[in-house]
Amino acid sequence: MVGSPRADGRCATLANEMFEACIDECPEDGVSVVAVSSVDVAPCVGCDACRKALSKDDDAYPEIPEKGDPLAQCNLVFRSDASAHQCVIGDDMAEVRKHLDAADELIVVSPVYFSGAPAQMKALLDRMQPYFWSNLRERTKERRPCTLHVVREGGDPHGFEPLVGVVRSALGVAGFKLECLVDWLGCFDEDGEIVADGRECELD
């Protein structure tokens, strides 16, 4: 998962290198990249449909629409006929969820914007809310490993703890556990090329 809104920046360079390395080292495994720069994911609007959909098995709720107006009138389906963690907003988040559900491991590469995630990345993370409601009954499931690679300039005196917190929280409800944090400060040259390895940091 690449959290930068720039399609060809340093995060993309790092993600592409890791993608190629994964293919070379584990050719039998499937590897996919989800970049916020190339997906259409709207922010959560707090409509509460995902919570209401899971309140009772017999309650009807809006069917997932095709891409388009998220507020458009939808048909109703029953809870028992649909996935447990769907959102009524019709955009690319449905495809993102398919990748998350199929993943055995997750790697996140993100820049730091004012100590936190870019708006596009934050919007995607906020859309994990349906997982929260569906997982209220499934807390015992084993979580899959997640690694966060932080690409930053280092000029913010407040660090990047807010980024770590939101990634850990949002992906936690999606079934992942943040196990490794890698800081790439000073590891890129002026042209955006990788010149050094990232440094693994301790997680609180």
Residue ranges and their predicted role:
Residues 1-109, 115-133, 180-182, 186-203:
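N-terminal beta1-alpha1-beta2 submodule of the flavodoxin-like/Rossmannoid cofactor-binding fold
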Residues 101-102, 110, 141-146:
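Short amphipathic alpha-helical segments, especially helix-boundary/capping motifs
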Residues 112-114, 153-154:
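Short glycine-rich anion-binding loops that position phosphate/pyrophosphate groups of nucleotides
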Residues 119-120, 137-181:
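Short, glycine-/small-residue-rich phosphate/pyrophosphate-handling segment
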